Amino acid sequence: GLWAEVTVPYVDIQLESGGSTAWFKSRLEDGGLPPRLYYGQVFWVDQIKKDEYGQTYYRVNPNYYGGLDTLWAPAEAFRPIHPDELEPINPEVEDKRIVVDLIHQTMSCYEGNSEVFFTRISSGAKFDINGNPVDNWSTPVGTHQVTRKYISLQMGGGTTGAGWDLPGIGWTSIFVTGGVAIHSTFWHNNFGVWMSHGCVNATPEDAKWVFLWAEPFVSYDPGAEDISISGKSSTIVEVVEG
């Protein structure tokens, strides 16, 4: 198999079996719109086929171990991710830390006292879609560490009717129990504004850079790492308010 990322604005997908997950059903129920994948999503491809017209299709999975749905999408919409792309950034540096500033909605990466990376992010939202204040979406303030990393992950939460379920979230670095993570974001481009349900939203490019720079480092296959199992060292994540 191989990892591949969507490189077009969107691509319609075909369902071979399943269709039971919330993200798929909600798309069908939303005016009968076709299920789609979007730019920046990352999937594990484990089969390739051609149709009667000679067009190549990938079978895409929400993560390395597959999922409840069996999906096919035109291969031309994807760029295969080569194993060389997962080479760690500055692996020889031991003193690394990530600082997420909730007030300014920024993220910085430090090697010692030197800032080597800076970007805008979107952390936990302060208001819901109706403008009502919310507290349970706040990104947890404090000193944490990256505990699990995934090249791609299907993430979900919330309650029935008001929940969310999204596959193919790339370059995910979890740093708080419960799934709070730095990860790629394909559903908005409003960075610098509080938008998430607690995670640190970043562009696909920024999330990938942090993923490759921060420990623990991840191998191509299976594309995941858990320090509770491997015992590997990990990078500190400081979430501050100003």
Spans of model-derived segments:
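A short, compositionally biased
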Residues: 53-55, 100-105, 167-169, 232-233
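A short beta-strand/turn structural motif
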Residues: 1-5, 74, 118-129, 133-135
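A mature extracytoplasmic/lumenal domain signature
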Residues: 49, 62-64, 104, 111-113, ...
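Exported/periplasmic cell-wall-interacting domains
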Residues: 91-93, 117, 128-129, 134-141, ...
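Beta-loop motif signature
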Residues: 9-55
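Intrinsically disordered, low-complexity Ser/Thr-rich linker and spacer segments
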Residues: 6-17, 78-92
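SH3/SH3-like beta-barrel superfamily modules
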Residues: 1, 37-80
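A structural motif detector for short, solvent-exposed N-terminal "entry" segments of globular domains
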Residues: 81-127
